[in-house]
Amino acid sequence: MALRRSLAFVLMLSSLAGALPAAEPPPTATIPAVSLRPTDRFARLQWDATHAGTAPWGHWGDQPGHYISWSNHSNRLVPVYTFGIGLDGVAGEQSPYRSEDRLRAIYGRLPEHTLNPAADYFDQTDVHTLQVAAAAAGKRRIILMVFDGLDWTTTRTAAIALSGNVAYDSGRGTGLSFQDYAGAPTAFGFCCTSPANDGTKVDVDAQALKNPGGDKAGGYDVAMGGATPWDPIAQPTYLIGRDRYRPHAVCDSAASATAFCSGRKTYNDAINVDPAGKQVEPIARTLQKQGWAVGTVTSVPIPHATPACAYANNVSRDDYQDITRDMVGLRSVSHRGEPLPGLDVVIGCGFGGDAPDDSKQQGVNYEPGNKYVAPSTLAAIDAEKGGRYRIAQRTAGRKGAEVLAEGAAAAIAGGERLLGLFGTKPGNLPFATADGGYDPVLVSE
């Protein structure tokens, strides 16, 4: 019962990630023997669809004739599951999409075709509101989990695959652990993911915007995109910003995660920077000032947009080395004088992501070597060299879980912070298959 009272958990299914393009069929498509295991009953379906470029058994997304999900970032309404806190303060009658004044406050203007007096959906900035409310309610642990690219339709597909049963066609659903968990008070809703704008150009070295406001505004037309995630979609290309009659900005991971973590709509590519170029503070740093321990755990490179927005500031999501400096409490291009305090725990990927030169994206202070974590950063924070972080990283011949557990134990014993750096090419964790293995049908080279 103590855990139920003290924990707030927000599970965010995000529509942000694009999909792999359909593969061209090879001269002869022979499925690898490793994928023919009877425990992986979907391997043949996936292999045939990947190499034919189409799936006769079904589709979702904007291209029915292709084996592809949504082919771009999108503005789909995405599910939000909460545990330990409700949605009454942000959804339904409290939806900001029912109010002109609240829409102006969120977007900085009144977006065209966006006001909806009947909206049940809330805004992605309200995910920040929920975390603030959880802290104010006395919750001692707040967890925000983001599944980048997993929307309502793919969640339902996974539930069908797991259970072998089509159990629902609307609402929260059933069949997956987070849908059925009843160990704490729980709620279900969905939010709009539109950004403030797209097309803002930046100067990474100066940490300045060249054209505040960009060239394309955000917004959400319910008549085009639907009132719920399971509604039939009038115009699928609208949701990916490719409708000629309603051109609009679609959200990327940086703008969306800034909204989740700092409660501010912004331009695509921004890491906790508002549309005018002003830095904003994510809730992790706000709570850290109040004595909270804060951290981020990710299956992608540590400074990628979503984990970066938990803590850092930068005008560009691609300035990886500086973003990592913010996350571990070193001076950076965005905090040149007094560095940020740094996260207590940082666990993620990016190991081996070497690049001789990435200065075009990361600016004049780019260091050759790992493009995600600069060599000088690892040296400066290493507890064995007088730094504040116990470093656990991918080690040849060792299981990552064992290396990480040993590092965590050493950090606890020594009163140190923890950095876990793992991953495979191109920097992420390996893909897990439905049967628990690590031999996906489609492997990126």
Residues covered by each model-derived region:
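Bacterial N-terminal signal peptides
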Residues: 8-18
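Short coil-to-helix leader/linker segments, especially the first N-terminal amphipathic alpha-helix
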Residues: 60, 70-136, 169, 316
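Surface-exposed loop and adjacent secondary-structure segments within mature catalytic domains
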Residues: 25-85, 93-95, 154-445
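Boundary at the C-terminal end of the N-terminal hydrophobic targeting segment
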Residues: 19-23
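Short, surface-exposed loop/turn motifs at beta-strand boundaries within globular domains
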Residues: 135-140, 251-253
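Bacterial N-terminal signal peptides that target proteins for export
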Residues: 1-8
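Beta-strand elements within well-structured catalytic alpha/beta cores of enzymes
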Residues: 139-153, 287, 421
